[in-house]
Each structure stands twice: as structure tokens, then as C-alpha cells.
Amino acid sequence: EFPKYDSITELDVYCNQNNKSDVQMYNFITKLESEYGNITVTVYKGSKTISNDKSILNECELYFVFNIGSNKRVVCLADNKTWDQSLKYWNSSKYPYPRWCDEYLTESEFVRSIGEYKFHVNNGTVKYWEKYYNFPDMVFNYSDKKHDLRIGSLDLETYGDNCFELGLGNLNVYAGGFALNDGFKKLYYLNNDTELNSGEAIIKKMFGDLFDYIAEDRKARNNYTIYAHNLGRFDSVFIIRSLCSEGYKINGQWIDNSILYLKIVDSTRKLTIKLRDSIKLVPHSLDKALSSNGCNISKGMFPHKFVNKDTLNYIGDKPDIKYYVDENKFNESKLKKYKSLPSILNLKKECLNYLDKDILGLLELMNKVSLTYFNEYKLNITKFSTLPSITLNIFGIRFYDDQNSIKMINGPLSEFIRSSYFGGNSDIFVSGEERLVKNGYHYDMNSQYPYAMLQSMPTGNPVFSTNTDLNYYRNGFVFARVTPPSKDTLVNLFIPRRSDDGSVICDRNTFYEFIPTPDLKQGLEYGYKFEVICGINFPDACGNGELFSEFVNHFYEIKSSSTDLGQKYIAKLSLNSLYGKFGQKEREYSIRLLEKDKAKEIISKNHYSYMSEVSDNYTLIKSGGRLNSKLRRLYAEQARINTINDDLLSSKFIKSRGIPSAVQISAMISSYARTSINPFKNIPGNLAIASNTDSLILRKPLEDHLIGKEIGKWKLEHKFKNGVFVKPKLYCYEDVDINELIRKASGVTASNLTYENFVELVNGKDVLTNKELFRLNWETLNIEIVNINTKISGIKE
């Protein structure tokens, strides 16, 4: 309970002016009133001292009341012996004793501010309280003045050691090559009669030649960035294993069970090569990326599954097409390409031709991408490991207005917001015989997430509050008791919740969940009821389009109208890669290759962990990532870590500071994306059959005004017949225009399933299928491809 607003003024006025200290006090107050002009100061006498230390506060406590206008005042607690050391800080957070500010609202209501807290008091009872936070702004890289042209490419070819199964078994390197921008290129092929008698020997020779070449002109060639397509979970494994005993210093970055980049240093000659994963910047197959960017070089065709230790020097009849293309990927285009190949195969010659195309094609691709990013945005791709990271910096350098500041939130608030961060809903809304759909329409929304980015965003600092009024939360996140509507009111539910096993469902029963305000407000319109318990509000949230409209409009215009394939490709990637970066949770780790004795010593003293025993003498270790240096400095300036004392938050979130991020932006964009599709799930007379994040399957067509090329409009992907809808991401139908069976099957190879298999699943029968599985063991640095059988359980209704 709190005293009334005027309770302090009911105390006795302190008026003792019989000693020198009191005279000085009143002179100070008079001077202060004169300087400010709009304040009056009254001193009241309390009944206690403000410390048990009698040597410091040996007289009475005093309340210095600074009246500011007619409805606001600051109260500073001091005593008549030490006031002169503290009162000069009366209007500052540096004030050393209790201090608060009261704002008069009505006869019974006032707001008391104490530090970061505000208590809203009515008749002596706190209605709700708020805690105000002050987090640092998001930081971005600076643009580059000089284009870094030191770019190269690298590729390794492998075969499976299981000669009786096509392409299966443990993978072994048998060929490799690299190419640099200045024209230097070399290819290597396994030959048991030469020094290149193993995959490790090939890799050692490759990097030995590279470093020797760099040493010839160190000034021009040092610090090359060499790209490999799928470095993170493929090439890097063989490279680390092969170079561990060659005397190179190897370190890099690791995230999400994949290596982001490797830095290989020849310490003796002070030479450095950086390896980056091109698939992290260009997230498509090399074949698709080359064609999408209008590259002159196209990927060749090669019988990977025909290669084993006994066929490396094969010269003879061209193998069957199954060695070139997986059976489930056969099509007319691939068949035509296969038929155009020579009837006689010289495997070594064709491998080197194929390898040559791969490294030169990748080099052409990365040069095109590099040129576009530098010419358009003055950024060197060689500084970035991922597409989201470079897109984030494009936004920061080119489009970010710091008047709408994005805060890097950490600790309990970050975890609160992250708990409300859901992806798009994936649902099947039919059951029983309705799973067999005679006719229907499959629609996709144009640029759903960029469309969501055009809405109001949670910019500025957050405020945690126990306010239970729905209208209080303009833009934010709440923890609430949710009561869904009956099926008569709303057939297809859409407010998500996490079940005990971690899965996301839309429940018909009452539940508690963390919810963004767009979901909450839309839910109210469709019959949901909410009882808010607490939440996070962003009072300085920007208006619609103020944060991202320039970014979205810029790239959408390029995507829609540019004739430059490279720019068009980058625009499409940029539109869809930015939002998730704000909410990145995965911590980046540093990795280091060390001699075992040194590794043990470092692990015992630092936050490193064992990763792999690379050889008898060397160990690969990893350590938890550190914050960006700019962020570390910003957080160091904060006097203390913000915490929340509320029991709900303390018990669940207070244990860890978490990783600073702007997860509020990602969570809000994801919420807007969900609300953009939800209304179409319950169209009267045309209820949805199924939906995914940005797609919708209906029995009847959408109205014409909803269809178009504009952002946020719908486009018809398939008009179909004979649909079978088993469960989310497991369905099929026949496209009526191309007479092709369209199959979706998450977790298995969809093309291995027949129409009859889907019908069996709907009828409750289990279906057995198989798929090739890529297994990477980081402890042993071993890669294996295996064929496994998988059972898909039938629907039991």
C-alpha cells in the first residue's frame, strides 16, 4: 500500500534555523527556486533517520518536496546533517538516497515514479506498475570505400566407399580444385602412383600450392576469400581433417551445427586464406543460382553415383541415367541433357571438366553477387558470412532512420518476447472423408513477410507492466489467459500455443500463452476472449511503414521490374531474409585447432568445450561467442543489469541474461504475417481445406480483387483435382493444367510416394518409404550417406 498523494504534506514543516547548517540549507533552497523559477521547495520533518549508521545520520529525516507546477512534485529523502552532499542531485539519478516523483491525477489517483518504476496508485492501492528500460540501439557496420576483388572458389569431389550401393557409404575425396580472380587455377585428381594418392594428399597439395602462389606476391594476394558451396557441412570437414598436422593455424566460426567460415594461416610466412560458405549468401543449389543470376557458365552433368575406388580411371560405355540423376528427379529436360552426352565416358576427363565448370561457375556467380552488393550498397561480401547479416547492414546503412530506434533487448524481457515468437501456422482443417477433395485451388501470398513489415513496429525502449487493460498495449506482447470461441462461432482456429511437447497447435480449450498484440486484437474480432496478466508495451512504437517501407519498396520494385537477373535475384533474397536476423538466437562460437596439451589447458581455464579429436596430436575446440565489440562497450556503460522482480518473470526468465537481439521486431513481423492470412481460413461458404505460412488451399476460387501481382495479394499456384490431405505438410493433388501429381511430404522424399500411398494414409494404413540421409559426425569428422527406411503412420480418427 502507498500513502495518499498529500500524506507527506501532513507532516510538520521543518523550520529550525538556529544553526549554521540550517541557514545554509534555506539559502541553498532560495537560490534553487530563483534559478528554476517554476519550482517551490518545502522541507518536512520525518520521524526516523534514513540510516542506522548514527555517525552519518544522527538527527532526523527530512523530506525535501520540490513542487513543479500544480500536479507534479519530486520528493527527496535526506537529513539535516548530510543534505548538502546530496541535494544538488535532486533532479538526477545520481541522488544517493530514496527519491521519487509524484504526479497528481485526481483526488484519489496519482503516479509515483521511483527509479525505473512507475506505480499507478488509487486510494492507496497500486492498480498496476511499470518498469521502464533503457537498452542500447542496434549497431550496424559501415559501408566500404574500396571493392575487395580477392575472391576465389573451391570444390571437392567425393565418392561413397560402399561399392554395392549407388553413392552410399563413408565419403572420400578423390578430386578437387580452386580458381582465383586473377586467373590462377588448379585441378587435382587421385592417382595412387603419385603424391596425390589420397584425399588428404589432394587437399594438402591444394593449400600448399595456394600459399606458395600467394607468397610470390604477398601484397596483392594475401587475405583471399575463397568460397565453397556448402563449406559449412561438407568441404570444411575434409579440409580440417587433412590440414590439422600441416602446421597451419586454423580457426573460424560455428553456428547451428555448421561452420560459417574458416581462417587458415601460414604463420611462418604470415599468409592468410579465408574460406566462406557461398550457400549461406546464395541459398540455392549451384545450378539454380547460376541460371537465376544469368551466369555464362552452367553446371554440367556427371555420374556421381557411378564413382568408386574401382572406377576412378574408367573408360567405356556411358552409364545408365540412374547414375547421373536420382530416379525421383527424372524429367524431360534431364533426359534430353543425358542423351546429348557422348556415348563413351572417360571418367577422369569428365570429372575434371565437371569440376572445372563448378569452380569457374561459382567464381563467376560470387563475382556477380559481389559486384552488385558493392555497386548498389557499398558493401563487400567478403566481410559477411550470411545473407541475413549483409541484408541487415544494407538496411542499417541505406534505410534505417534512428529516430525509430531499434533496441537490442536482452535478459528476461528478451525471453518473454521470444516466448511469443511463433512462425506461420501449418494446418489441415478437414477430417474423415473430407480429406479426399475432388476439386480445389492452391494460392500463395505475394511477399507475405515483406508485406507484414509495412505495419507498425515496436521501436524504442520497452516497458514491462502489470496493467491488465487490453487497450493499454498499443504495440507489444502480453501473457494472457486465452479462451477460444466455440466451433459455431469460429470453425478454423488461428491463435497458436505451445503444447507440453513443444509442438505448436491451435487449441479449442482455454490456455495461457504469450501473445503479440496483432494476434490478440484480431482474436477479439473473431470471438476469442483474453484475460491479460502482464505484458510488454512499446509506447514509442513507430507508425505503419515508418521503419521498413523504404527497404521493402526498394527491393520489391527491383524484384518486380528489373531486367538485371543478378539484381532481381538479390532483391528477392533480401526481401525474405531480413526479418529473421533481428530475432537470431543461435550463438556464434569460435573454433580453434590446437595441439592436445594446449587444448586441455585452455579448456580447463576458459569457457571452451571439446568438439573433435582430429588426430592423435590435435583437437578441435569451440567457445561461446562474444558480443560484438560495440555492443560490449554499450552494455558496459550501463550501471547494472535490468531485472524484473515479478514472481512470474523471476521464476522463468531471470536466470540468464540471454543473447541481445531485437527479437521484438521478428516476433511482431511474424505476428502480422499470421494475421494477414487468418481471415481467409474462415470465408463463409469457402472454408479453408489447409494452410501453411503463406499459402492457402480452398474448394472455391478467391474473389478477383484479391488476386494480383502487388505485395500482399494472392496468386493462384495450382488448380487441382483428386486432392488427398493427410496432415500438415503431407498431401497431394493433381494439377489440372499440367496433369502432374503435386506432392508435399515433410521429412521424407515426397517423390517416392504415390497417390495410392496418400490414400492409404488417410484410410489409417501405415506406409513404408525410404530416403537418403546425409550424416555428419563432428566428433570423428566423418561424412556418410545412408539409405534408411521410414514409416509414415496412417491417420487414426
UniProtKB/Swiss-Prot annotation:
It comes from the Eukaryota. One of its GO terms (biological process) is DNA replication. It is an enzyme of class 2 (transferase). It holds the Pfam family DNA_pol_B_2. Its EC number is 2.7.7.7. SUPFAM superfamilies: DNA/RNA polymerases, Ribonuclease H-like. InterPro entries: DNA-dir_DNA_pol_B, DNA-dir_DNA_pol_B_mt/vir, DNA/RNA_pol_sf, DNA_pol_palm_dom_sf, RNaseH-like_sf, RNaseH_sf. Transmembrane segments: none annotated. It is found in: Mitochondrion. It catalyses: DNA(n) + a 2'-deoxyribonucleoside 5'-triphosphate = DNA(n+1) + diphosphate. SMART domains: POLBc (SM00486). The keyword NAD does not apply. GO terms for cellular component: mitochondrion. Keywords: DNA replication, DNA-binding, DNA-directed DNA polymerase, Mitochondrion, Nucleotidyltransferase, Plasmid, Transferase. GO terms for molecular function: DNA binding; DNA-directed DNA polymerase activity; nucleotide binding. PANTHER family: DNA POLYMERASE, DNA-DIRECTED DNA POLYMERASE. Belongs to the DNA polymerase type-B family. This DNA polymerase requires a protein as a primer. This is Probable DNA polymerase.
